[in-house]
UniProtKB/Swiss-Prot annotation:
Signal peptide positions (record): 1-26
Keywords annotated in UniProt: Endoplasmic reticulum, Glycoprotein, Membrane, mRNA transport, Nuclear pore complex, Nucleus, Phosphoprotein, Protein transport, Signal, Translocation, Transmembrane, Transmembrane helix, Transport
Native source organism of the sequence: Homo sapiens
Gene: NUP210
Compartment annotation: Nucleus, Nuclear pore complex; Nucleus membrane; Endoplasmic reticulum membrane
Domain BIG2 stretches: 1078-1151
Family: Belongs to the NUP210 family.
Main location: nucleus
Protein name: Nuclear pore membrane glycoprotein 210
Amino acid sequence: MAARGRGLLLLTLSVLLAAGPSAAAAKLNIPKVLLPFTRATRVNFTLEASEGCYRWLSTRPEVASIEPLGLDEQQCSQKAVVQARLTQPARLTSIIFAEDITTGQVLRCDAIVDLIHDIQIVSTTRELYLEDSPLELKIQALDSEGNTFSTLAGLVFEWTIVKDSEADRFSDSHNALRILTFLESTYIPPSYISEMEKAAKQGDTILVSGMKTGSSKLKARIQEAVYKNVRPAEVRLLILENILLNPAYDVYLMVGTSIHYKVQKIRQGKITELSMPSDQYELQLQNSIPGPEGDPARPVAVLAQDTSMVTALQLGQSSLVLGHRSIRMQGASRLPNSTIYVVEPGYLGFTVHPGDRWVLETGRLYEITIEVFDKFSNKVYVSDNIRIETVLPAEFFEVLSSSQNGSYHRIRALKRGQTAIDAALTSVVDQDGGVHILQVPVWNQQEVEIHIPITLYPSILTFPWQPKTGAYQYTIRAHGGSGNFSWSSSSHLVATVTVKGVMTTGSDIGFSVIQAHDVQNPLHFGEMKVYVIEPHSMEFAPCQVEARVGQALELPLRISGLMPGGASEVVTLSDCSHFDLAVEVENQGVFQPLPGRLPPGSEHCSGIRVKAEAQGSTTLLVSYRHGHVHLSAKITIAAYLPLKAVDPSSVALVTLGSSKEMLFEGGPRPWILEPSKFFQNVTAEDTDSIGLALFAPHSSRNYQQHWILVTCQALGEQVIALSVGNKPSLTNPFPAVEPAVVKFVCAPPSRLTLAPVYTSPQLDMSCPLLQQNKQVVPVSSHRNPRLDLAAYDQEGRRFDNFSSLSIQWESTRPVLASIEPELPMQLVSQDDESGQKKLHGLQAILVHEASGTTAITATATGYQESHLSSARTKQPHDPLVPLSASIELILVEDVRVSPEEVTIYNHPGIQAELRIREGSGYFFLNTSTADVVKVAYQEARGVAMVHPLLPGSSTIMIHDLCLVFPAPAKAVVYVSDIQELYIRVVDKVEIGKTVKAYVRVLDLHKKPFLAKYFPFMDLKLRAASPIITLVALDEALDNYTITFLIRGVAIGQTSLTASVTNKAGQRINSAPQQIEVFPPFRLMPRKVTLLIGATMQVTSEGGPQPQSNILFSISNESVALVSAAGLVQGLAIGNGTVSGLVQAVDAETGKVVIISQDLVQVEVLLLRAVRIRAPIMRMRTGTQMPIYVTGITNHQNPFSFGNAVPGLTFHWSVTKRDVLDLRGRHHEASIRLPSQYNFAMNVLGRVKGRTGLRVVVKAVDPTSGQLYGLARELSDEIQVQVFEKLQLLNPEIEAEQILMSPNSYIKLQTNRDGAASLSYRVLDGPEKVPVVHVDEKGFLASGSMIGTSTIEVIAQEPFGANQTIIVAVKVSPVSYLRVSMSPVLHTQNKEALVAVPLGMTVTFTVHFHDNSGDVFHAHSSVLNFATNRDDFVQIGKGPTNNTCVVRTVSVGLTLLRVWDAEHPGLSDFMPLPVLQAISPELSGAMVVGDVLCLATVLTSLEGLSGTWSSSANSILHIDPKTGVAVARAVGSVTVYYEVAGHLRTYKEVVVSVPQRIMARHLHPIQTSFQEATASKVIVAVGDRSSNLRGECTPTQREVIQALHPETLISCQSQFKPAVFDFPSQDVFTVEPQFDTALGQYFCSITMHRLTDKQRKHLSMKKTALVVSASLSSSHFSTEQVGAEVPFSPGLFADQAEILLSNHYTSSEIRVFGAPEVLENLEVKSGSPAVLAFAKEKSFGWPSFITYTVGVLDPAAGSQGPLSTTLTFSSPVTNQAIAIPVTVAFVVDRRGPGPYGASLFQHFLDSYQVMFFTLFALLAGTAVMIIAYHTVCTPRDLAVPAALTPRASPGHSPHYFAASSPTSPNALPPARKASPPSGLWSPAYASH
């Protein structure tokens, strides 16, 4: 049963496999696997599917079993292990099936088990260098047919080093090699090798390394017993030293000069120099060839072996060879050599660095080098013993250093001007010091031009951004240089500059560097910066802010912006006159804004004007809004009234020499923002009798009051004038001044009093120092106390002022307190007891910040002579009685506490110190809260110790009991636990670079703890992986932060976490901070060279992963444009730089930061000339050579111009057509490219000869400026020589050779492999070094030498015969490479395609050719493939090194470049145009219901068509054979066309919703009688007249009918208006159909058989039939337009029969019908005795005709009842009805009839009842007969195009005249007239 079940399963799997692959099928990793037969071990191979979950089955488990890996709960897996289970040696096969449990898809793999027939060793090289990386050797096993086994995993081998018979010249050669295990190395082996090495077994893969130089042989055999007869595999390895010769290039020397050679060795990647002479190597000069006039007996050069110095003796050449001293090693390895040419000096050359231009700049350092060349321009080695005399004018140059031989000078340019440098090669100095003068010195001169450096003025300009481009302009001045400058702007979006230096602002915000480069040397330039920035701040410039009422103020504005770059540098804008400013006045009525704005000035950019209208001050607000910019500035301005005197209003009283404090009001008030700047200036009427001084008491807060100190110089009266104003200040730099006058009177004093200005302490506690003596006052030693000195007259009245008295101030301790003249007595107005104001004299005492007790005494001894003399008082005057007063002061320091705020970590081991300093020493401390901290004051130390108790905050207040202090000293203490940790770090770092991470610990209020608390928290910072290193730094960002240095050491991502331990011992971690280490970010290619209109894509490598969007930008957008995808398009001639930025967002600031960037250079140029790039000029017949067009430089390759728009066309021609064949690049694939893509061609040599190859490059649009000088075309021509291949004519045999490149290998294969015993050897003689090596397995390998060798292949047949082949092997360098394309594209009519079809996968194969065009059989090149853009094709590596696979994915042109990685000169370019291969080209989107006829010219090789398929048949159903598709649903779909095993292309199709479905009635043309088609209504789905897209073949039209597209639509009908009680479906059948000829849908309408009721209703009421169509089962709304179809139900009579008699000879009948039918209605009678004529016609609604039916012959019916038929018919519609007519004769009994009485008459009169009875019977019979024929007679009538019934054409029109009324064929005649458009019912009889 199991076998039967397995058979059923296999049958099922076979059926599933036969069904074919699905559209998105999964794949296995291998189709067939070959496993070796083993007994001791089991060899496994793992099968893996790309996706899905599978159940696995082996058809023959005894041959190969299958075991799933990683079964899930559904007992399925994606991987399984195949194991060889065969027990007997044989070749058997088992089929492995894998069935997807979800989709049912079945995958298949064949497992073959066979015996190993042969093994061989595979290696990458046969040469090893000492101390180099080891070499991996691998066994490859073959079966008897030469097939390679898939795996040898687990098979045990024995590897041994054996004696090499051919290496006898090497001593102990078997010790030169060592076998390593992978466990000893740093390399990762396969997993099974690791397991075998652990079991001390050797597998199929090993490592070997060289121990010493020599040759060694390695042998491997299978240990499995069954393979004991399999011949072991052997390989011979050569171990060498890596030796270099320095210099390695050819050297040119002068006679008498020398050069020192070095021999170097490479070991482990390091170059070390060998000491020469050496016991291993020696240098030799060979092949000395003297010049034409040289001495053959003398050597050209000599070599000093002890110094390795080569000295040139005479003209000629010689070879320097490095060789082995050991004879046995001389042929084993190849050592470098060099050629030495001894030449005469030809001329001198000058170079300068930097710049390489001889236009220099003063102050710069330059290096000048004089080079020697021979007459062939070969650079001669400048040795130290030559002498070059150089003259550098000291006036222009400062020589900093020079070389001994005079060839190198380091100088500084000093002076502006023009000069010349002279140099002459004069002599050569030999080793003995002898000077050999050249007979003809080599001399040259270099002219030099020197300029001063270029500077631009101004250096910085700033402008605000405005939406209008070019809002601001400025002319920049340049100084220095040659005067001819090239101006440039780094950002044209910010600012542009003209050739004359006129700068214009652009449309973007930012900064632009304006540079002026010297045209003569672009290295020299000057620059300035233009900033176009958003306004950041606005302020008013210093100006006058006070105005008298009625005056105007000008208020200038400064608007500033932030400089870009993040440095927060603020700069004032140069011009903001275009700003739309809004002005607001805070207090209305004080100032009124005036229209207009101030022009820009040196200190402002704009401004406003206001007018003072009333006294007062106000704030003026100016604001600016634009977008997100909101700026505002405020300024305070004031308006004042004229100044007037208040106290005294007119007179003031003072003593002689004293002063009076006068109060004035009005005038300019003290500036509200800076009142201290207020001043009053006073003048007197008589300056000889008074002194004036201004005074501003601090106690006054009335800014309208002004105080004047007037000093009396003589008794009397005086008029005082006062000027009031403010001194200049920051907010009032230009104040106003107002004047006023008052009268002044003097009088003498009598006594003085002195009192302190004292305030009691705030606390109720008293100071211990206070005593009962009120004259003892404690004061602060930091604040100057004031004493109140008063003067009284004899009557005890207080004087206004006494400052003119001679007051002697004394202090008992001047070191503590003193009175300084700089602090004169101040006069303060105070109210006395009477309410009158008196002046108090306040004297400030100057303290000196020292503590102690002192007494201050003030004594008035008289008038102050100095004051009197300075006031010029009049003498003599009465003496003053001495007066005095004193007071004692105690001076102490103010109490201070530090710090004033501290945060304490809540930890028992932490306490904070508050240092209390100074004060009186008597303090009282209290806290705002009692349970947060504990405070203890240590009086001895002056420290308050604070211990944390609970989290919270508390304010500690220190009160000084003995000091007048405004407030106690306070310190706020915060106690907090740890809330969180915060890490700030940039989340990306480039590998090898560093960033800093900052860690803070935050308390409960999110405030940071001090860093000194971190040791109590055990703070640590850790990384999740070791891709970064963390080092704590000692540097501190602040007192709250610890800094770590992060260095990226490996690429990847990790996270940072900081952690601390809290008071409870719990570990608190920060949120992980992600950080990525990324590789360096680079843009490729490094330089982009483009033609105008050409495009190239810039790609990137490295950078952060996953890489965010790269922001591309270009420095000069007028030269080129760059898209977001990196596509660079050339616009104009010039240079630029494309910048690629990788940005990230700073987590803390939210700002975008640049984490990496790179630049590439862009050059947009025009083609000055074209060149044909041909790798060789001589080629052999039958060979091919690629050619392509380039510019005049290497950068001007096809990538630069191949895809330019408008493009170039390339036209190739040869002068001799029979010599060369020109072929397109894709000729082998049957693709013929148009001329615009033919920048690259292939050339085939046909016959020998020489021909010219010419290309003409034409510009499609010469005005686009792509060619130099707006040329229309450029051309180039080369000569190509084609020569015949060398052949033997006698005997006439083919002599072939194997062509190999250096360091390549090939496996030779013969037709006798496996059948005969083959041996290989090289036949070169012992004197010739072979250029190739071959082993016994036929592996032919070439070395680095070029040349030819001969190999011999001998086959020993088992039957005794031997065969020998001798083949020449040529080793030659690769000259060029050529690319071919596959597969070949076949078309129906063999026509060539113009592009690669879209969706196709093609393979490009690279062929390598030598300098004759022959193809290499083996090469060692490593190829690179690149495209100019990546959006049209996808490129990937092919199955071999010389292939690549390209898949076309989009329509467009892509350029492909192929080059050798080691030899960039070996390159080729190809065009890859991609076009649609499937027609038709759809002008617009398809709609549901469209029928599409797809076509393509692509066929198979046999010319057979491929298979069509659709990615979604539910949307677009397609016939697989013909390509007919029907759009069934809305959506996007891909149509595939596939030629099995050959090609596959596709086309994208979009199916949309039709906007409307419109029905249109089709008016038919004239039709014949026999046509019976239904009436049609054309249905247009969508906006097109036809729903058939594309050109359809007859076969496709047949398939369209089979697809039944009409099922997509449904037809509906309805009466309009709906006046009937039955639906239209009871009358009409409406069916959808599709016309394949016209491509149109239509609805076919057929009328049913009508009942009498239906016919009556339809005839009596007017209605229309409306036919519409809709999409079947559509869920979207579409406009439906119906069509009205006219119809007629036919003719209808109001009577079913007519009865006539001789008494009733006439009757009326009314016939209803359509008006167009009734107009031509004909009536026919079946008997001449009955006549009908129209009586009344009505064509209204309903339409009818009334007929009168009468009997012509009165005797009719006298012979018996007459039965006949009236037929009403329409010749237009062929409609007809038949009405039976019966005529009966009745005898009148009232008198004789017209013919007299008769017996028959009497009979009738007697038997009247009988006659009526007979009449009834006859009439009934007639009616029955007519009804029978009407119903049962076969009808030839059908529904015509307008649903009109028609008669058979065989009936005569005169049928009724010749036929009996009772004939069964009594139907209306047929008419040939075509009916009108409409619907008509059949001619059914009415009963």
